[in-house]
Amino acid sequence: MSVVNRRIAVYPGTFDPITNGHIDLVSRAAPLFESIVVGVAQSPSKGPSLPLQQRVTLAREALCQHENVQVIGFDTLLAHFVRHVGAGVLLRGLRAVSDFEYEFQMASMNRHLIPEVETLFLTPAEQHSFISSSLVREIARLGGDVSGFAPAAVVAALRQNL
């Protein structure tokens, strides 16, 4: 078992793209931890619409007001990444009951792979509970206005890449 720091949390995701819901979760979690590492996953199986480095850059811009938050891209197993940064907590968001089954399965697998790390679930603020990266991408792809769901830099990146 690795030595972990429960004051360091990893918030993993594809962040394709980062949304106001993700930003809200990090903003509310930031005071709870000494450090939050936002881990932007390569996730080739998901076929991200934005390249990894661009997703990292957009997340850094969106979260730059938090001194204790860093954004790092990774292309390894999440368990390896968590151990690499020495985190003792995995942060996950639960928007609705529909998220629960998948998140419960992932938390159980992570508990098996990294038993020294706890998974902490946070729910979004009500105004962000319906936002998902896939919906934001789809609305943007079809020419809809996503400015209420993501930062301006993300909106511009989606317009350019979709």
Curated annotation (Swiss-Prot):
It holds the Pfam family CTP_transf_like. Disulfide bonds: none annotated. ATP binds at residues 14-15, 22, 93-95, 103, 128-134. InterPro entries: Cyt_trans-like (IPR004821), PPAT (IPR001980), Rossmann-like_a/b/a_fold (IPR014729). It catalyses: (R)-4'-phosphopantetheine + ATP + H(+) = 3'-dephospho-CoA + diphosphate. Its EC number is 2.7.7.3. Keywords: ATP-binding, Coenzyme A biosynthesis, Cytoplasm, Magnesium, Nucleotide-binding, Nucleotidyltransferase, Transferase. Its cofactor is Mg(2+). Pathway: Cofactor biosynthesis; coenzyme A biosynthesis; CoA from (R)-pantothenate: step 4/5. GO terms for biological process: coenzyme A biosynthetic process. Substrate binds at residues 14, 46, 78, 92. The record marks 22 as: Transition state stabilizer. Transmembrane segments: none annotated. It is found in: Cytoplasm. GO terms for molecular function: ATP binding; pantetheine-phosphate adenylyltransferase activity. GO terms for cellular component: cytoplasm. The keyword Repeat does not apply. Reversibly transfers an adenylyl group from ATP to 4'-phosphopantetheine, yielding dephospho-CoA (dPCoA) and pyrophosphate. Homohexamer. Belongs to the bacterial CoaD family. PANTHER family: PHOSPHOPANTETHEINE ADENYLYLTRANSFERASE. This is Phosphopantetheine adenylyltransferase.
